[in-house]
Amino acid sequence: KKYHYEGLSFLHGDIADYTGTDSADMVVTLHACDTATDYALYKAMKWHAGVILSVPCCQHEVNKQIACEPLEGALKYGLIKERLSALFTDALRADLLEENGYDTQVLEFIDMEHTPKNILLRAVRRPDAGMADGQSGLTEAEQKSGQCCKEPDSKRLAETLQIHTTLQKLLEGE
């Protein structure tokens, strides 16, 4: 009300259960814990949101799954495994956004002295992109250049780390 926005609402609940819209101009998530970020990103992609700003929180899902022989020496230390898992989770999310029609950046949005959870996934929908509705997220030029035949970065990363995230499952289930 203070800023005179019309039609803006805030809801409290589980994003996985939310069915109240077919489209959104912008989706913002702040510290959505673990797989809640995946559900929010998936819904934002389904709604063809023009802009997605997401600040993920805890990423336990990958921490429970990650297994990578070349990284065994580092992954045996709980703290390092936790931090690497969080970074790999956000890298995978960024790759999936890219593959589904978004120009994506991974940014530090606030100094580490304020909070260690300071990664922002900023995704802007490409005007000529398909999306998570069964169409390719590649532009026509990328499809013509043969990039459509290249194995997606997200798939290679997930296979290397032996992980399968909620966002991957949601996108595969379409």
Describe the residue ranges of each PLM region:
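Class I S-adenosyl-L-methionine
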Residues: 2-174
